[in-house]
UniProtKB/Swiss-Prot annotation:
Co-factor(s): dipyrromethane
Entry's family note: Belongs to the HMBS family.
Catalyses which reaction(s): 4 porphobilinogen + H2O = hydroxymethylbilane + 4 NH4(+)
Taxonomy, superkingdom: Bacteria
Assembly description: Monomer.
Pathway(s) the chain acts in: Porphyrin-containing compound metabolism; protoporphyrin-IX biosynthesis; coproporphyrinogen-III from 5-aminolevulinate: step 2/4
CDD domains: PBP2_PBGD_2
Record bears the keyword Transferase: yes
GO BP: protoporphyrinogen IX biosynthetic process
Cofactor binding summary note: Binds 1 dipyrromethane group covalently.
Gene this protein is translated from: hemC
Organism whose genome encodes this protein: Clostridium perfringens (strain ATCC 13124 / DSM 756 / JCM 1290 / NCIMB 6125 / NCTC 8237 / Type A)
Protein name stated in the entry: Porphobilinogen deaminase
EC id: 2.5.1.61
Length: 291
């Protein structure tokens, strides 16, 4: 038997899927192969995500492959997955979470603190752009899209002083050496689910148990808390929303940020990790209480 796993065509998406394939072989002794799918988010690289719908643009065509029984499961970056899935699907596993931090990439090794005044920084993320302005309001934010390799090329092509990328993607691609600096995730909050992988299947799928065996309880605890936070705030690519969460013993600690009445609000919460979804909701309500 060979499981078919749908994923995007990008190098990073394929590397992430290969990691899941390795885990399937290692834990379940099951062979698998990739089904590469071109998503709307991959096709429309000329427009910023917040103008064409944001979250879900990297998921819909892949879900169609599951619906058409062309694949048994799909691997996503959790930060691309909308907080509400269509009723036919479920997230059966979140197998691993890489480094959750954002990374600063510059070709000359500059760090954020020693950049020239008015430096040009590339990012298409409102979350990154708004938090960056809190550090250095003199910086010029330049919107860029494309895969990791394309964005790095744009440093030269668009005369940028640097760009911001997720550390997880760079590490998975073996490109850690291009990182000049890391952002403290408790200060510069990551995207919801950043660094985490998710496996989506049709509900009640015949082979779902193979994928479920790869689930990490700790990863699921943190990511579900963050997604609960996002759901209350209805946040996506068009708004500043970020969260940091960590499990320590029986506790879950979370920090969240969101824009309320044009003001960036940041709050934290601590509670029992078994109440992860409730804690995410309470943190969101705490932030909305600032209205």
């Amino acid at each position: 038997m060979e499981l078919i796993i749908a994923t995007r065509k990008s190098k990073l998406a394929q590397v992430q899927t290969e990691k899941v394939m390795e885990l399937l072989k290692e834990k379940e002794n099951v062979d698998s192969k990739k089904l590469l799918v071109m998503t709307e988010g991959d096709r429309r690289l000329d427009v910023s995500l917040n103008k064409i719908g944001g979250k879900g643009l990297f998921v819909k065509e892949i879900e169609l492959a599951l619906l058409n029984k062309e694949a048994h499961g799909a691997v996503h970056s959790m930060k691309d997955v909308p907080f509400e899935l269509p009723s036919e699907f479920e997230l059966v596993a979140m197998p691993e979470r890489e480094d959750i931090r954002d990374a600063f990439v510059s070709l000359n090794g500059s760090t954020l603190s020693n950049l020239r005044k008015g430096a040009r920084i590339g990012t298409s993320s409102i979350r990154r752009a708004e938090q960056l302005k809190l550090f250095r309001d003199d910086l010029e934010i330049v919107p860029i899209r494309g895969n990791v390799q394309t964005r790095i090329k744009k440093i030269t092509e668009e005369n940028l002083d640097g760009i911001i990328l997720a550390a997880a993607g760079l590490k998975r691609l073996g490109m850690e050496d291009v990182i000049s600096d890391y952002f403290d995730p408790k200060v510069f909050l990551p995207a919801i689910g950043q660094g985490a992988l998710g496996i989506e299947c049709l509900k009640g799928g015949e082979f779902n148990d193979y994928f479920k065996a790869l689930d990490s309880k700790e990863v699921r605890t943190t990511v579900e808390a963050e997604r609960s936070f996002m759901k209350v705030l209805n946040g996506g690519c068009h708004s500043l929303i970020g969260a940091y969460s960590e499990v320590k013993d029986n506790d879950l600690y979370m920090i969240g940020t969101f824009t309320v009445n044009n003001r960036i609000v940041k709050k934290d919460i601590l509670g029992n990790k078994e109440d992860n979804i409730l804690l995410g909701k309470k943190l969101a309500e705490k932030i909305l209480g600032e209205v």
